[in-house]
Structure formats: C-alpha cells, structure tokens
C-alpha cells in the first residue's frame, strides 16, 4: 500500500465514511484508518436513521452524492414520515434499521469506491511540516507513518473516551472497545480548547422476554418512501418480493419506575458531579426526564427491533448511567417488561473532545475540495492555528474565518 495520500480520515463511523467517500469521488486518494475494520459504520446507539431535523440532513447528503440515504434505505426494516401534521418542509423521514446490515452495506459501498484504501490501526500522533506549518501526515500506534496533504478527524467518542455505569468508570470509546490516546494531548499542546460532551445508550433487551400484549403496536407507513432519490435500494419498494416492515412497540414508565430509579440517584455520576460534559439537547436520559419533568407520571418508551434476524431490542427513551441493579429493577416494573432480560446494560459515554473549538486567533483557514468535515468531524489543516469545521463541504478553494458556535 502507498504511504502517501491526498487525505487521511481517522475514524470510520458515519461521518468518517461520508468524508472518505466524498473526497474519493472527487478524485482524491484517501486512506481511511479505523481501530477495527469489522466495526466500520457501526450503529453504536439506536438502530435508526433520520428523524426530526436529522432526516432532512440525510436527504441533503444524498442530494450532494453521499451514501447515507442509500445505505439507510437498503438496511431499513421500517419507514415512518414524522411531523406529517405540519407543513411538508417539516416532514422528517426516519427508518428503523437492521444494525448489522447497515454496517455491512456501508462497508460494501466503500470497498466499491475507487481511491479509498483501508488501514486497521490507531493514530497516536499528527505529523507537522514545520517549514510550511501544515499537517503532513499521521503516525500510527504500530509505529507506521502515512503522509497526507490533509487529515480529517472523525473520532466520535474514542478520543480519551470514558464510560460511566453507576459508580464505575471504564476507559473506552464504546462498550468493549478501547479509547484512543495521543491526539487530544497533542491538540491541547497546540492551544486547542478541550472539553467533554456525553452521550448515553439504553439497555438492550431479549425480545423473547417481552410481553407485547401489554404494549401498543406501531406500524410503519403504509406507503413507505425513501431517503435517497435512487429508490432501487429500498426493500419495501422492490418490484420482486418486496419485504413487509417490522413493527415497533410503545410502552410507558410509571410512578413506581420513577421511585426505583430515584433510589440510584446518589450513585449516578450525573448527579454526583463525575460527569461534567454537556448532553444532547433533545435526547435526555431517563433520570434527567424524571428530574426536569417531575410533574409527569409517565414517559413514553419505544421498543425497537435491532434487525430482521435478531431478538435483540433497543429500548428508546431509557438511556441512563444508573447502577445495573437499579436499571433492571426499574425495567421490570414497566408494562410488558416484567420478565425482561438484559443483553447488556445502559451507560453514559462522554466524548474526549467537545464539538466546539473556539478560534484563538483571527487568522483565516484555507479549505479545499478534499477537506470535508461532517457532523462530529474535525478538520486539522493548519498549525499552530486552531481550526474546527463542524459541518463543511466546500467545492474549491476558499478562505474563511471560524468562530465559536452559539445557541
């Protein structure tokens, strides 16, 4: 394999995959580095794509030639158009997806894309050309050096990642996977501001232990649409043997569930100050909801299948960082889940780097077509300036000045 590339993308999550594909399709020679080739495009949290606001973004990515829409359509097990009570501009497509098929489809599409090479390794250092004061490549955990004109960081939760379950803290980027070290320390040394954000995930449940008769069924749309303008990928619209959609189910918490959860608040890292990061605004944890909306006697939960051929269930709306015994005890007081068995518990996973890095100078940042930054993607091109492009896709050279995001 060549040791020099136009672009190196570090991290093969959804953002990294889109960045690599976009650059490769524009003629750049790309190296995609990931810690594990078997987890390319892993759906780390809920097995779904789109929804309010996010669905519009996926369709915009599709219009720009991205792959997310086609992959989502090909791996969908249910389609729903949300917000239909509002005007068409507010309609939000959402798919429930087969977790394994989603990742496999992404990998297949990347492998069929010219100009992309793959390498399984960690990156411990960004290399700098001191004469031009620009990125010149990366050094991997195995001691290899790859040269590049530009580097995109799409590390997700892996940069100095930490997992919290009750009073336990585990170093890791994802459950069962190690965190990545070296890049954060280097960026801090250069003067970048580092912070933490947090994301949580609910428990995965054995679907065979659920009493669905005590829940409400939620079918997909009778006339399903697609994310992509290329509708050939949808299993529901194929002319030969179209598939039936898999239903989701709805249940609710109750005061008894809330009281059980409260017994673990004294051991919750969120309430004890061990987690300082900001959480997603529209996806609060179950303990957040109980605290902030204490007047409510119940909160809606969605029982979502993880794929066509698995009994694993994702309990949407029940993310938390409480101890395992509190989780299970509360879970079994929810209608339909009285005999529920967990495959693995929920946890809170702070990221090692925040999504806003303020420019410390007024100098501009030169970006070209090869430098693509998507959600949770960080572009590092100049040194010692401190650029960060939260969501940028630029065709052609342009000079811009980055400023901090504000709500």
Regions found by a protein language model. Name each.
Residues 2-15:
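Beta1/beta-strand and adjacent pyrophosphate-binding region of the FAD-binding site
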Residues 339-365:
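Gly/Gly-Pro-rich "capping" loops immediately C-terminal to redox-active cysteine motifs
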Residues 21-127, 142, 154-171, 178, ...:
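Conserved N-terminal/central alpha/beta ligand/cofactor-binding core
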Residues 127-145:
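Conserved beta-strand-loop-beta-strand element in the redox core of flavoprotein oxidoreductases
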Residues 3-5, 141-150:
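Core beta-strand elements of the Rossmann-like FAD/NAD(P) dinucleotide-binding domain
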Residues 200-215, 285, 291-298, 310:
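Terminal amphipathic helices with adjacent charged low-complexity linkers/tails
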Residues 222-275, 297-338:
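Conserved FAD/dinucleotide-binding core of flavoprotein oxidoreductases
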Residues 364-407:
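Flexible coil segments in periplasmic/lumen-exposed cytochrome c-class electron-transfer proteins
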């Amino acid at each position: 394999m060549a040791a020099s590339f136009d672009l190196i993308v570090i991290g093969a999550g959804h953002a990294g995959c889109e960045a690599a594909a976009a650059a490769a399709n524009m003629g750049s020679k790309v190296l995609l580095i990931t810690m594990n080739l078997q987890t390319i495009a892993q759906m780390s949290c809920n097995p779904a794509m789109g929804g309010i606001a996010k669905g519009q973004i996926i369709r915009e990515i599709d219009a720009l030639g991205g792959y997310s829409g086609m992959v989502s359509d090909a791996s969908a097990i249910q389609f729903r158009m949300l917000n239909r009570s509002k005007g068409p501009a507010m309609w939000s497509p959402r798919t429930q997806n087969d977790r394994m098929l989603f990742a496999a489809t992404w990998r297949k599409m990347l492998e069929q894309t010219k100009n992309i090479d793959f390498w399984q390794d960690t990156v411990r250092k960004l290399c700098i050309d001191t004469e031009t004061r620009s990125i010149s490549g990366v050094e991997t955990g195995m001691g290899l050096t790859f040269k590049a004109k530009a580097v995109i960081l799409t590390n997700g939760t892996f940069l100095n990642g930490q997992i919290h379950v009750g009073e336990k803290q585990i170093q890791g980027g994802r459950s069962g996977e190690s965190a990545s070290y070296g890049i954060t320390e280097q960026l801090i040394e250069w003067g970048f501001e580092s912070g933490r954000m947090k994301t949580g995930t609910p428990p995965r449940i054995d679907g065979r232990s659920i009493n669905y008769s005590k829940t409400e069924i939620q079918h997909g749309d009778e006339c399903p649409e697609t994310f992509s303008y290329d509708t050939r990928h949808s299993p529901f619209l194929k002319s030969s043997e179209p598939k039936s959609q898999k239903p989701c189910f709805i249940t609710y918490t109750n005061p008894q569930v809330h009281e059980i959860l409260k017994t673990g608040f004294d051991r919750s890292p969120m309430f004890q100050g061990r987690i300082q990061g900001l959480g997603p605004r529209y996806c609060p944890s179950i303990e957040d909801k109980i605290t902030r909306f204490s007047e409510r006697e119940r909160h809606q939960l969605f029982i979502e299948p993880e794929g066509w051929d698995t009994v694993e269930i994702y309990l949407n709306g029940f993310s938390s960082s409480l101890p395992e015994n509190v989780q299970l005890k509360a879970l079994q007081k929810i209608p339909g889940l009285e005999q529920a068995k967990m495959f693995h518990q929920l946890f809170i996973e702070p990221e090692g780097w925040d999504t806003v890095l303020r420019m410390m100078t007024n100098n501009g940042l030169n970006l070209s077509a090869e430098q693509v930054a998507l959600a949770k993607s960080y572009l590092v091109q100049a040194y010692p300036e401190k650029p960060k492009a939260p969501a940028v896709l630029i065709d052609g050279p342009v000079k811009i000045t980055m400023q901090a995001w504000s709500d």
